[in-house]
């Protein structure tokens, strides 16, 4: 197919048009007074959201060159969402500001490569400033405040997340589910999560979320590969008779065995799923033993002389529910004996005390958290399904933000931390033409605060000027329309979220500024619609009246 090529100024202008189209749609959601965006769906009710990455992911532009610009900024939002779980709107606003400011300088004849290097150095200086401004989260109150801000100033969500973290520990597993009632509640269930997803996507029970859920399943725990169906068949027949689902945890399930399981799952003969065993080597054996003790099962192990063909239902583990996605498996409410579980916990604690290796200690603590930490389930309630989906997305964002805050600490919110980084960039040792790139970042660091103020109905430049003339965590609280100490007021952002938003924005904007040519498929001008059916289409169907 023929290609169309755009060069230099024309290419950058088209890219900027795409960047602006996406950033304008995302930026309206920024801050506590940000607006909602309604997204049409091919089926079902429209989605109402205030989440930047959800808006960004829906945007596809007709012009291929403009679309390239939009897709590159979409990458900023997606990457920030994947690594920090929040801050997608901030990242988008920053990326647009850096590209827009940089474009003016490139048009004026400055070297794009020098500008990019200046942007990279300024980004480093700004990140150092954020780290210096950062404070660790010490209290449950601070965790609740981070959750509240991320959930669009919803205190209920912030408090529930803080309570969940308090109950299962900061390293514990917290999941978000839809409630049957209008109330948002917290349940803490004993369980275990490990980082292995389903072996085949055909095991999925919810194709929209790509999740496999099994209720009251039997669990077969095998330390080797399963490739032969013959040994597995008696167990499958027994579980099918009982009408119960079966989860297989093994080193791998492949060949004939996997094909048979998938075919039976698709036909509806068996409710089944298979996941790879977590860990490697001796650690895998230990983790499989942990799962066996938690669920009251027996590990199929050659070392112990236990063979698959000799296994009966009594040797299988049991639990209340298993949830599997492409990356993780969560076993909830295992049926193992309490005394056996306590003995295992005691044993792992003794190993932690005895070990001299930091790596081994870390892995043992992970296992301990999985055995005793349990799983906290936040049940999100709302009056309608549309509100439920929107609220659930906010809870997930808030949960990611609080985890990030626990990891790297907190900085003042409301765009103030980025404004405070401007001085650090100005003082950084950046010379020559690269200084122009640093000025681009200094100007862009103002953009999130301007946007928050604009969305709150204030004049961004006036608010920015007032904040610049103060120090530390003093800034503008858009929710209450006051100037105050934002950390005291509970307007805080996780350092990790702000840092990654800035780093991702600088990375992609720098790439776009150094773009000199763009190539896309040429639109086919001869491609028309489908030809009309002869004889006026379906007029001949009138004869079907006689069939009534």
UniProtKB/Swiss-Prot annotation:
Q: What InterPro entries does its record include?
A: Chaperonin_Cpn60_CS, Cpn60/GroEL, Cpn60/GroEL/TCP-1, GroEL-like_apical_dom_sf, GROEL-like_equatorial_sf, TCP-1-like_intermed_sf
Q: What does this protein do?
A: Together with its co-chaperonin GroES, plays an essential role in assisting protein folding. The GroEL-GroES system forms a nano-cage that allows encapsulation of the non-native substrate proteins and provides a physical environment optimized to promote and accelerate protein folding.
Q: Just give the chief location class.
A: cytoplasm
Q: Name one Pfam family in it.
A: Cpn60_TCP1
Q: State the NCBIfam families in the record.
A: GroEL, PRK00013.1, PRK12849.1, PRK12850.1, PRK12851.1
Task: Give its E.C. classification number.
Answer: 5.6.1.7
Q: Which family does it belong to?
A: Belongs to the chaperonin (HSP60) family.
Which GO terms of type biological process are on file? protein refolding
Ordered alphabetically, the record's keywords are:
ATP-binding, Chaperone, Cytoplasm, Isomerase, Nucleotide-binding
Q: What cellular-component terms does GO give this entry?
A: cytoplasm
Q: What is the lineage of its organism?
A: Bacteria, Pseudomonadati, Thermodesulfobacteriota, Desulfobacteria, Desulfobacterales
Name the chain's protein.
Chaperonin GroEL
Organism of origin is: Desulfatibacillum aliphaticivorans
List the PANTHER family hit by this protein, alphabetically.
60 KDA HEAT SHOCK PROTEIN, MITOCHONDRIAL
Q: Which Gene3D superfamilies match?
A: GroEL, GroEL-like equatorial domain, TCP-1-like chaperonin intermediate domain
Q: Indicate the enzyme's highest-level EC class.
A: isomerase
Catalytic reaction annotation: ATP + H2O + a folded polypeptide = ADP + phosphate + an unfolded polypeptide
